[in-house]
A protein has these predicted regions:
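HAD-like aspartate-dependent phosphatase fold
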Residues: 1-192
Length: 192
């Protein structure tokens, strides 16, 4: 195994690297975390939970955990604060919604303009209705900053169906540029 002492930090992905979709450790994952010890930083593109919430889920399943656990939701929150984004329309689940409400105002109506349309995960329910609301918002306001907080499109292993990255692409593409001013920002692995 490489000498990890030569590195200041070792950033590793979670899903498919350390654990499966049920957060069960993969073979060799605990040993790897032991070897990299306090240099380890777990980064997950999850837009639905924070690093603290992910660490809680993993606690007790691994003998050792990285000293730091970060998710795309954590990076999104920092981005919203640093960019002074005060109002958003949120396309995502209730867990992310609760976290985002601590730092910004979430608007439930598409009638008034917001600072950004934020995509964190697939909505818990009524995702077709939520998708239609995004399309109506774009059509009505003609101007939107769209932020994707989970840029994964393809996942390793067996196909699991639609994900929020695919929905973001479907909802944000093919608008005539001369009529619609859409800016797209992806937050995740590229942002660390």
């Amino acid at each position: 195994m490489n000498n990890f002492n030569d590195y200041e930090h070792v950033v590793i992905d979670g899903f498919g690297t350390l654990y499966d979709k049920n957060f069960i450790p993969l073979e060799g994952a605990s040993r790897l975390l032991d070897v990299i010890s306090d240099k380890g930083i777990l980064f997950s593109n999850m837009g639905s939970i924070s690093g603290l919430q992910l660490k809680d889920r993993l606690n007790g399943k691994f003998e050792f955990l990285p000293r730091k656990v970060i998710t795309s939701l954590d990076i999104l929150c920092r981005f919203l604060i640093s960019e002074n984004i005060k109002t958003i329309y949120h396309y995502g689940g209730k867990r992310a919604d609760r976290t985002l409400r601590n730092i910004t105002r979430i608007v439930n109506s598409i009638d008034k303009p917001v600072n950004a349309l934020v995509f964190t995960s697939l909505p818990d329910d009524n995702w077709i209705k939520e998708s239609q609301a995004i399309l109506r918002y774009i059509y009505r306001h003609r101007d939107a900053k769209m932020i994707l907080a989970n840029p994964d499109r393809l996942l390793p292993g067996k196909h699991v169906g639609l994900n929020v990255g695919m929905m973001f692409d479907m909802l944000s593409q093919n608008w005539p540029r001369q009529e619609f001013n859409l800016s797209k920002i992806e937050i995740g692995i590229r942002s660390i």
